[in-house]
A protein has these predicted regions:
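A fold-level detector for beta-propeller and closely related beta-sheet-rich head/sensor domains
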Residues: 1-320
Length: 320
């Protein structure tokens, strides 16, 4: 994972490869702090406890990152309430391993504690909740260039290329892909575009067109893409009114480059490059599958021909 620091604040980009070679990988940006524990400098969570499991080197099961809040009782379908991650069909299901005494009434499927789960808490939770009634307030820009000039404009559905699904029976549109970018469409289940029938013959896999499950309130659970090589940049700069602003800048492999308020975890704005527009449909469709080294031993040439390399977007470090 990549990280950026400012004073005692540590911002860590996280990701998890998707199962079944799917290209939509979940990610998040989480904040911890450096603190003194028994005279030693340690990475600590929002409660001031050591955040890292000393045996695994990963974030501990009961650590709670900054910005993360309890979502044990949120709006669900049918006018009921329940834990945010209940019934969303995520694989693996992010069930907390903390005991009942530690949870103190919180659900094991709440965002808090987020522990090592990528989707839980952090910036992802704040973006979901920041726009829980409508994504229309999100500032998503399109960056276009002409020579040495860079221009920013609001991203619109007409900016996206015409869809070209690998499955001929697909009926989704550029408007669906646009809603997915904003978080109001959950995207498709995805997978391999062809599959074997009972006669061992390849046919189109219509199951990849099944929709993911959309939460009853808020934006899609997969609102934040993976952060693999993008190191978060922390920057303090002068504002127009004479004060100073502190922001965190970083890219992720859902096609967006983000600016976050480190106090709240809120997304101030995000932008997409015109050079990345052609790959956004693949994020929505979650297909074709990713081509990894060594797959030749497990698949025949017809299936291998449908695989494509994993897409990378704003995947490097930011400089000033």
């Amino acid at each position: 994972s990549q990280q950026g620091t400012s004073e005692n604040q540590v911002f860590i980009g996280v990701f998890r490869p998707a199962k079944e070679r799917k290209p939509r990988w979940p990610g998040n940006l989480k904040q911890y702090k450096l603190g003194l524990i028994d005279g030693n400098v340690e990475l600590v969570d929002a409660n001031g406890d050591i955040a890292v499991n000393s045996q695994t080197g990963f974030i501990g099961a009961c650590a709670t990152s900054e910005w993360t809040t309890d979502t044990s009782q949120v709006a669900k379908s049918g006018g009921t309430t329940g834990p945010y991650f209940e019934g969303l069909g995520l694989d693996p299901n992010p069930v907390s391993e903390c005991d009942a005494d530690f949870l103190n009434g919180r659900s094991v499927l709440s965002d808090s504690p987020d522990g090592p789960f990528v989707e839980k808490g952090g910036a992802a939770q704040q973006i979901r909740g920041q726009h829980n009634s409508s994504s229309s307030t999100r500032n998503i820009f399109l960056a276009t260039s002409s020579g040495t000039s860079l221009s920013l404009s609001d991203l619109t559905a007409s900016d996206l290329p015409t869809v070209s699904s690998a499955v001929s029976s697909a009926t989704y549109t550029t408007a669906d892909v646009f809603d997915y970018v904003h978080g109001e469409d959950p995207g498709l289940a995805g997978g391999d575009p062809i599959t074997l029938d009972s006669n061992a013959s390849y046919i189109e896999n219509d199951a990849i067109l099944d929709s993911e499950i959309m939460p009853a309130d808020g934006l899609r659970a997969s609102i934040h893409g993976d952060i693999i090589h993008s190191r978060p940049l922390t920057l303090t700069y002068g504002a127009a009114n004479g004060s100073t602003e502190f922001r965190v800048f970083y890219g992720s492999n859902d096609g967006l480059y983000r600016a976050l308020d480190p106090t709240t975890g809120n997304e101030e704005w995000s932008m997409m490059s015109e050079s990345h527009l052609s790959e956004i449909e693949r994020q929505y469709a979650n297909s074709p599958s990713v081509d990894y080294d060594g797959l030749e031993a497990s698949f025949d040439s017809q299936m291998l021909a449908t695989f494509e390399p994993k897409p990378y977007f704003f995947d490097g470090s930011t400089g000033v």
